[in-house]
Amino acid sequence: MTTPLVEMDGDEMTRILWQMIKDELLLPYIDLKTEYYDLGLEHRHETDDQVTVDSANATLKYGVAVKCATITPNAARMTEYNLKEMWKSPNGTIRAILDGTVFRAPILVNGIVPYVKNWTKPITIARHAYGDVYKNTEIKVPGPGKAELVFTAADGTETRELIHNFDGAGIIQGIHNTNKSIESFARACFSYAVDTKQDLWFSTKDTISKKYDHTFKDIFQEIYDNEYKAKFEELGITYFYTLIDDAVARVIRSEGGFIWACKNYDGDVMSDMVATAYGDLSMMTSVLVSPSGVYEYEAAHGTVQRHYYKHLKGEETSTNSIATIYAWTGALRKRGELDQIPELCNFADKLEQACIKTIEDGKMTKSLSLISTCEHPVILNSLDFIKAIRETLNSLL
């Protein structure tokens, strides 16, 4: 390696797996260079979350990052970790700095049949990675009063809309997005569809959200008509817009094989649904692609809290590390492409092949065994599964 990856460490069970993957599958094989940032909740707390901002800025500098799953604290976590503040989602902070789009796709393996039987091809979720509820401002309303939405233009002109006249306690939320970010999102989706030669679907709720969601719809249509329509027609692929509820029904009836572009929250929810329906959330790749050509790879799942508590008690866990391994392989391959190191790309390919072959040979974690058609699966603990992948990798290299 010539340029380091930006390495963002994380929390709980995924943090344990992170080190296992490095020790067993990376360090023995490659000259791994990383610029390390500890995004574990304790360290974010110690640095007042500055470490998250620093890691995102380092990603802008170097171009490729790999991120471990992290805790986004809620009230229970504030008590558990004795936090002075309910720190924002690290992913939300990073995505706000990098902008871009999150593409999530299932890892398909022979022997793991989707719950939706007609899904024979992967569905890629393209999730807008900026704004909306992830960069919101919230107020708990203590009692009666008037809530208003106020925009003050640069020249001092005010636009004012009544949100609600409260006669008691309640809640208010302010969300935003920018045309620039929506345009970047649209172009990323159309470009990805052209690159992968797949149809693109986009869905919002513009019938209810006549300004906010309708702006998303209008920007997508304008960019498609002006910049991508001819290319789509040349490739024989289509762009299709529909309401989010109709899209969900169509997705379930489909055979897969397309990109489904979603707003930030919709993409968060639907990527979990799609991943689980294909088999397991730990079998889902995730990459954030920014308009400036910056890439951040991560697993699409959380920190596996339940397994971590078992691990702390000294109990054995059988945690699927595939998506976290694929975060590393995605980042290493992209680094190899950018730095023209074919050996690094080849290693990433071989490690992914080793993951698939290990599962198809019947060696897997407990969650995979529950959905596998393999008659006599060998259920391995977290470390032994990684060691089994290492054995397969050795046979492929």
Question: Language-model features: where?
Answer:
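N-terminal small/polar loop signature for handling phosphorylated ligands or for N-terminal nucleophile
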Residues: 41-55, 217-258
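Glycine-rich phosphate/nucleotide-binding loop
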Residues: 251-350, 357-361
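N-terminal alpha-helical transmembrane segments of multi-pass membrane transport
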Residues: 13, 17-18, 23-47, 56-59
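Glycine-rich phosphate/pyrophosphate-binding loop and the adjoining helix
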Residues: 129-130, 135-186, 193, 338-341, ...
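Glycine-rich phosphate/diphosphate-binding loop of Rossmann-like nucleotide-binding domains
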Residues: 1-20, 149-242
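N-terminal glycine-rich phosphate/adenylate-binding segment common to multiple enzyme folds
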Residues: 42-158, 171, 265, 269
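Flexible, glycine/charged-enriched surface loops at secondary-structure junctions
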Residues: 30-36, 196-204, 228-241, 336-348, ...
